[in-house]
């Protein structure tokens, strides 16, 4: 599948590349699992509600989440961190 990143998600991903390789590896494992299994698999996938209806989240760790949706052959990644984290 094609991976499409929002600006915020890409910024989060670049942050993890510089700051924490363990978290980066977890994000890559989650993306690989999303590519293979869609809305099931590791990271406790759960559908989001209300304004984010149609999106799903998976746990990166205790605080951070990857937020995504799948349409046709594309994974749209909206977030891969926490909006609580100071940059």
Give residue ranges: language-model regions:
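Enriched for short, Lys/Arg-rich terminal
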Residues: 2, 11-25, 29, 42, ...
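Residue-level signal for threonine
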Residues: 6
